Amino acid sequence: PEVSGVSLNEAGEPIAEGLTVAETKEKLMQLMPLIKERLHFLCDAAEMVRFLFTEPAVPPVEQIIPKKLDAVKTKEVLEASKEFIAAIATKTEEEADALARQIAEGLGVKLGDFMMPIRMAVTGSRVSPPLVGSIKILGVEKALERTNRTLASF
């Protein structure tokens, strides 16, 4: 049965729409180190990986806006996040974190208020594996597409 955009073929191997068995396995194996510390129960994994295999709906704007920001500032954050997302492919985790802090500081927002709208745009959820690793596995182009789609809702 399909739970997270991934189902099993007759041989019991994971398959996802548009991906080969090998590609599906590769994405799952890349994601496992990111989610293992966050899992309370194995069944929680399905929800955490859904964004990799299915296109999440754009969340309602109210859910994207951090508590301490308004819609205008959140849209500004999402616009600025495109630079961050585009740079992730060539950055280490530490370099990406430093860049996120630098951009957030330049916008005058806290790091969490910078990252939350990006997380919502890219994964469709407030809870996900670490964002930088998630974007690398998903792919920068796909993350930018989702960010632009979310921006269009503002």
List each language-model region with its residue ranges.
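Small-residue-rich helix-loop
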Residues: 1-107
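Charged substrate- and nucleic-acid-binding regions of tRNA-handling and nucleotidyl-transfer enzymes
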Residues: 94-154
